[in-house]
Amino acid sequence: MTAAAAATAPNEVTEMATETTALSPRFYTTDVKAMNELSVEAVRAEWDKLMAEFAADKNFGHFKRTDDWAFDPNDLPEDLRKELTDFMVSSLTAEFSGCVLYAELHKKGFDPDMKTLFKFLARDESRHAGFINECLRDFGVQVDMGFLVREKKYTHFSPKFILYATYLSEKIGYARYIRIYRHLEQNPDHQFHPIFQKFFRWCNDEFRHGEALALILRANPKLLRGHNRMWIRFFQLAVFTTMYVRDHTRPAFHRALGIDPEEYGMDVFRITAEISKQVFPDILDVDNPKFLAGLRKIHELALRIDASKKKGFFGKLRAIPLQLGVGVRFLKLLFLPTQANALPEEIRVAPAW
C-alpha cells in the first residue's frame, strides 16, 4: 500500500461499519415518489399531535457527555472492551443507516407531511449516531461516517418494506434499550459504561419514531392486507432472528451487564410483539416453545457456518448445506401459527415498559 493510500484507508471501526453481512446493519434506498404518494389524512389529528411532539424536541441537548462522565476502556478486560466496541459500532451503523435514509427522503420528497416527518427522524438519528461516535473517542477511534456513506453497499426496498422494517427497527430498539435501562436501575453495579444512563430518553426517541411509522401504515390499510400479511410476518421473524443470533456473539458484553442474552431476547420480543399490536394484523407467537427451539437451532447452525468458513475453500463448501439448513429452519418458524390481532381504533400506545 502506498503512503497516499494508507492515509486515506479507513480505520478498523470504519471497516467494521462498512461490512455487509447477514447480521450487520444495512443501508437502504427506496422509491421516494411512491413513499410520498402515501397519505396520512385518515389519521390527521393523531399525526399533527405527534408532529408537535417532534417539534418540541424534548431531547435537545441530551446526547452530550456530562461533567461526571467517567470511563476508561483500560478498566475493562480485553474481551469486554472488544465486544463493547462492536456493540457501539453496530449501534452507530444502525442509527446512521436511518439518518441517511430519512435525510434522503426529506431532501427528495415533495409531500409536506413526509418531508416534515423525515426531517425530524433524520435529526434524531444523526444525534444518536454522532453521540456514539463521541463515545468511541475513549477507545481512540471514530467511524468515518462520510466514508460510510460513500462505500457501504445499499439495499433497495420498496416503501412498504421500508415501513415494515423501520417500524420494527425503531420499536425493537426501544424494547432493547428500555430492558437494559430497567435492569441497570435494579443492578447499578453492572453499569460498566455511562452510555447506558442515556438509554431512557434515548429509547423514547425510538418509540416516537415507531409511532409515526405506525400512523403511516394504519392510514394506508392496503399495506396491512392480503399477501402483505405474509411479508409482515417475514419481517417480524427476520428482525427477531437477527437479534437473537447477533446478541449471542457478545457473551462478555451480556455477562458484564448481568443479563442472559436468551432471556433478554425473549423479553425484548414480547415487548415488541405487544407494541406491534397497534399496527400488525398478525403477531408472532414468541411463547410457542417451537419458536425458541427454532431460534436455538438457527444459532447453532450459524456457529457451525462461521467455523466452517474459517477453514478455507473446502470449509466454505461444507458451509453450504448448513446455510440451507438455516433457510429451512427459518421457513419452519415462518409458518408457525401466529396470533390474529384485531387492530385497535386508537392507534398510538404509550411507552409504558
Model-derived regions: residue spans:
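Non-heme di-metal
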Residues: 2-353
